[in-house]
Amino acid sequence: MFLINLLIYIIPILLAVAFLTLIERKVLGYMQLRKGPNVIGPYGILQPFADAVKLFTKEPLRPLTSSISMFIIAPILALTLALTIWTPLPMPHTLIDLNLGLLFILSLSGLSVYSILWSGWASNSKYALIGALRAVAQTISYEVTLAIILLSIMLINGSFTLKNLMITQENMWLIMTAWPLTMMWYISTLAETNRAPFDLTEGESELVSGFNVEYAAGPFAMFFLAEYANIMAMNAMTTILFLGPPLNHNHTYTCTISFMFKTMLLTSAFLWVRASYPRFRYDQLMYLLWKSFLPITLALCLMFISIPIALSSIPPQM
């Protein structure tokens, strides 16, 4: 029974990720005035399955000088963390109803750095290591902004529970009242998931492929799946935090359809950004965070703390 539950949980996420890769290739194709994958199946719809069969049936190669255990553990850890991050998300029902759901997601997104760092270090390649170190610096930096934004949301929400956010946003979505936070959160999630224009870790022109340059076949596919699962999870988080439930939220299916639609819309924006913008320079990436996002998020966090105290003359009841 446990195995069946596990498969029911994992397979839909992996299927969604598979079709997201197809949609991305199609979107990029049409934006560059070409067709994209259109050979395997009608309109290329079976392309992800062909890719999966090809990757998982090839021999997984590894460099002779690599550290075997870390080299193997890194992609497994990446995919495990990417799948685990979905457990506390209310869609509208959660798999695990955690009291500290916001903290759990923040800590898991921070842990994903280790898989990238291990893969870069264990590969024993200078390109992989440079890509991994870039990823660590980038992710840790943007984690600061994400943490402060989540703290601000927690002050509005009154608790760390994600389900409470649905009750908080019954009358008005938080994007209406905290739109600067929404914009900064969305841009920070782009950086957190190493997506264009912040894909410094995978700079093809200078690092060949980045931290996963020495990976092939199955382990490479695991990193690929983890990246796209993280993208969808982050967009699901954006929907929960700022775009709330629909106005008629008494019906579970209405909530679920609305949640799926908004997550798909945000994910499509990720693809649009990738097709439209060039890569940031590394100093611009850090300047954006430390000189722009950090002061603004701190100021907004202080505002959310001070307004209830100023208006009620007493500390808010948490």
UniProtKB/Swiss-Prot annotation:
GO terms for biological process: aerobic respiration. The keyword Transport applies. It is a multi-pass membrane protein. This is NADH-ubiquinone oxidoreductase chain 1. The chain crosses the membrane at residues 3-23, 68-88, 100-120, 136-156, 172-192, 223-243, 253-273, 294-314. PANTHER family: NADH DEHYDROGENASE SUBUNIT 1, NADH-UBIQUINONE OXIDOREDUCTASE CHAIN 1. It comes from Monodelphis domestica (Gray short-tailed opossum). One of its GO terms (cellular component) is mitochondrial inner membrane. Keywords: Electron transport, Membrane, Mitochondrion, Mitochondrion inner membrane, NAD, Respiratory chain, Translocase, Transmembrane, Transmembrane helix, Transport, Ubiquinone. Its EC number is 7.1.1.2. It is an enzyme of class 7 (translocase). It is found in: Mitochondrion inner membrane. Belongs to the complex I subunit 1 family. One of its GO terms (molecular function) is NADH dehydrogenase (ubiquinone) activity. It catalyses: a ubiquinone + NADH + 5 H(+)(in) = a ubiquinol + NAD(+) + 4 H(+)(out). Core subunit of the mitochondrial membrane respiratory chain NADH dehydrogenase (Complex I) that is believed to belong to the minimal assembly required for catalysis. Complex I functions in the transfer of electrons from NADH to the respiratory chain. The immediate electron acceptor for the enzyme is believed to be ubiquinone.
